[in-house]
């Protein structure tokens, strides 16, 4: 003998309590003798009954809305985390730390994007900033990041990676609805490639240059003018990556979006990022995780927690060591290896 268990729909259960409250109020009004009286006491009791029923209905609706909002945030948080996924603490000998904050309250991901991928061509990183901020920019972030994650493995040349990103952005803008102001859409992008020997090459489309931390010295990685941002203008024919020196063992790169340096205090003063970095490493070099924590704490103090734009930070430190040949005049070159500290990527 089979038993079929019928499940009552959740919506029916949710409506049961307010329906019962409403029925109780109507029954009281129509059937209770006290409700038919016109005395002051009867009026007070009747008002109290209807007030209690109304309060119960309001609380029930509020609880249902809060529960639904919590579920929506959980789904949105999972989707956003899949889009801008947490980076592993170590990538091919590099110690990595990253964090971002959306200007839209309740959104985990905004218009800033970053990714670091180990490939056969070297460690490749991207840092970008979509025009606008918050949830409205997520579609463009998804298009650029998706193209980057595929292109870095397929393309041996960094210039061809950038062209793939440009084509992905162009497709995304063309697929937007006619009501969106796609003519004003643009994305700043910084592409970096760090070879096994620490050699850095870069392509920069309108993005702030990162800072290079060597011991307690802080300086920009490059000072050349970047290319225009992706979107408004076509890329030039020649996309030769710019050599930017070497990331030696112990050196760090600090990538950031313009929301960091554009953050203002109550008096309208901009955040002095280079000075903050110099203060962070004044005594001794610190880990990427500590750099990110220190900078975010300084930003919160500077703006009093009122950021007007999305902000993102990405720190890469070369934890590889070099092995030199012991015998003088021995043939061969130094080979990069890695050691095994156990850093954390949690802030």
Model regions: which residues?
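Primarily the active-site beta-strand->alpha-helix module of PP2C/PPM metal-dependent phosphatases
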Residues: 107, 113-176
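Conserved subregion of the PPM/PP2C metallophosphatase catalytic domain
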Residues: 1-77, 81, 88, 113-122, ...
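Acidic, Ser/Thr-rich low-complexity segments on the non-lumenal side of membrane proteins
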Residues: 81-119
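Preference for bulky hydrophobic residues occupying beta-strand positions
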Residues: 98, 125-128, 192
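Short alpha-helical scaffold segments that flank and stabilize functional sites
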Residues: 79, 83, 147-150
């Amino acid at each position: 003998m089979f038993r079929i268990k019928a499940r009552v729909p959740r919506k029916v259960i949710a409506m049961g309590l307010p329906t019962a409250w409403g029925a109780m109020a109507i029954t009281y009004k129509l059937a209770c003798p006290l409700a038919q009286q016109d005395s002051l006491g009867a009026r007070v009791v009747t008002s109290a009954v209807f007030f209690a029923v109304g309060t119960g209905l309001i609380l029930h609706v509020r609880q249902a809305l809060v529960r639904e909002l919590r579920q929506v945030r959980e789904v949105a948080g999972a989707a956003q985390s899949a889009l801008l996924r947490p980076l592993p603490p170590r990538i091919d000998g590099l110690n990595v730390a990253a964090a971002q904050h959306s200007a839209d309250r309740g959104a985990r991901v905004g218009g800033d994007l970053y990714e670091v991928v180990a490939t056969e061509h070297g460690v490749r990183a991207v840092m970008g900033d979509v025009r606008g901020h918050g949830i409205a920019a997520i579609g463009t972030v998804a298009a650029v990041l998706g193209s980057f994650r595929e292109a870095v493995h397929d393309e041996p040349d960094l210039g061809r990676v950038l062209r793939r990103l440009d084509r992905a952005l162009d497709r995304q803008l063309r697929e937007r609805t006619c009501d969106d102001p796609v003519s004003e859409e643009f994305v700043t992008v910084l592409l970096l490639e760090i070879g096994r020997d620490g050699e850095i090459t870069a392509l920069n489309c309108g993005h702030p240059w990162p800072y290079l931390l060597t011991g307690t010295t802080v300086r920009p990685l490059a000072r050349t003018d970047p290319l225009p941002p992706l979107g408004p203008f076509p890329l030039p024919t020649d996309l030769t990556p710019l050599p930017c020196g070497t990331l030696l063992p112990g050196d760090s790169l600090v990538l950031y979006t313009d929301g960091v340096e554009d953050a203002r205090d109550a008096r309208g003063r901009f955040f002095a990022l280079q000075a903050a970095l110099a203060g962070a490493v004044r005594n001794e070099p610190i880990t990427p995780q500590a750099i990110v924590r220190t900078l975010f704490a300084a930003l919160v103090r500077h703006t009093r927690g009122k950021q007007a734009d999305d902000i993102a930070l990405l720190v890469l430190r070369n934890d590889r060591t070099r092995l030199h040949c012991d015998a003088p005049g021995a043939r061969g070159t130094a080979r990069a290896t890695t050691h095994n500290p156990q850093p954390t990527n949690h802030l």
